[in-house]
């Protein structure tokens, strides 16, 4: 679809495709019209349009229905305010890959709605149920083999999906990401050391892709994790606890201002981060057998 094509032009092309019995093309054109916010209705001698919701809206993550996505992998972003950053992130993705994108938006999507097309869709919820539960809702309702969760502050500088998909398809790693590290066992698991590309103990949610079946087998993300910080580490160790391996890669990405950290109230940030990390220490500290080889 090009920007110059109106819904009328697309609808006529759909009629022509149906007449030629090219039903796959007709379905694609129907979806393009839907992305513009309309349902096309066949009538005698032509067509008419009915306005439709451009995205679903739910009261709870438990109400979210299956998210239709083509392909083996989908990029997911949780958007809680800072819409301009989310728009920038979506545009850099579109400029570098055709991979489907789903934004789980808390509250009103505002101008982000203007980015909806065949590649990008929005799922909105009226209340924030926390990072862990929001991410699990995406994991549960996506039909893809792999899911990628990224922060709105992450920007694509090139195609970061192709190399990730190549590694995941090998089946050696349950998760692949951009930033991560090895748990520092010398300080009682209280820090993580970035050792660069290679096998790691934990990956961070700036950009992390994983096998959905492996993630589900590990128990997914912790619904008690209201805040993102350290929840990604907890998920990583859950994967390693069921023999999942994690790979950190050098990828064409950069990070802008991380609003989830810098623009969150300090007391909330520190309290929730500590709660997440305390769970890590309680469950995993001392279980060195689940860690990756030291390097």
Question: Where are the model-predicted features located?
Answer:
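Short aromatic/hydrophobic "clamp" motif used to bind/position activated sugar donors
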Residues: 147
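Active-site donor/metal-binding and catalytic loop motifs
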Residues: 45-47, 248-268
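A recurrent flexible, glycine/aromatic-enriched loop bordering the glycosyltransferase active site
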Residues: 191-213
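Conserved donor NDP-sugar-binding/catalytic core segment of glycosyltransferases
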Residues: 155-189
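Short, acidic, metal-binding catalytic loop of nucleotide-sugar glycosyltransferases
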Residues: 91-100
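Donor nucleotide-sugar recognition loop
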Residues: 216-240, 244-248, 252-254
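Glycine-rich, basic loop-to-helix element that forms the pyrophosphate-binding segment
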Residues: 125-142
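N-proximal low-complexity "stem/linker" segments adjacent to membrane-targeting elements
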Residues: 53-91
């Amino acid at each position: 679809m090009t920007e110059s094509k109106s819904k009328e032009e697309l609808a006529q092309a759909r009629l022509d495709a149906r007449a030629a019995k090219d039903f796959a093309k007709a379905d694609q054109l129907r979806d393009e019209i839907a992305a513009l916010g309309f349902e096309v209705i066949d009538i005698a001698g032509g067509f008419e349009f009915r306005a439709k919701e451009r995205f679903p809206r739910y009261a709870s993550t438990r109400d979210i229905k299956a998210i239709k996505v083509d392909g083996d992998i989908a990029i997911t972003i949780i958007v809680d305010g800072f819409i301009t950053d989310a728009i920038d992130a979506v545009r850099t993705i579109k400029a570098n890959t055709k991979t489907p994108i789903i934004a789980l938006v808390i509250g009103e999507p505002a101008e982000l709605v203007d980015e909806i097309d065949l590649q990008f869709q929005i799922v909105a919820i009226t209340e924030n149920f926390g990072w862990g539960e929001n991410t699990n809702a995406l994991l549960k309702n996506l039909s893809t083999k792999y899911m990628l969760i990224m922060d709105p502050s992450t920007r694509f500088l090139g195609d970061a999906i192709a190399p990730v998909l190549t590694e995941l398809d090998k089946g050696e790693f349950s998760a692949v990401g951009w930033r991560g590290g090895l748990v520092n066992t010398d300080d009682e698991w209280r820090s993580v050391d970035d050792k660069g590309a290679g096998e790691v103990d934990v990956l961070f949610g700036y950009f992390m892709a994983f096998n959905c079946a492996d993630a589900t087998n590990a128990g997914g993300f912790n619904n008690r994790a209201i805040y993102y910080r350290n929840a990604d580490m907890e998920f990583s160790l859950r994967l390693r606890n069921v023999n999942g391996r994690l790979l950190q890669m050098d990828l064409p990405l950069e990070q802008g201002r991380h609003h989830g950290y810098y623009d969150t109230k300090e007391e909330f940030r520190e309290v929730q981060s500590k709660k997440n990390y305390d769970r890590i220490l309680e469950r995993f500290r001392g279980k060195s057998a689940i860690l990756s080889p030291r390097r």
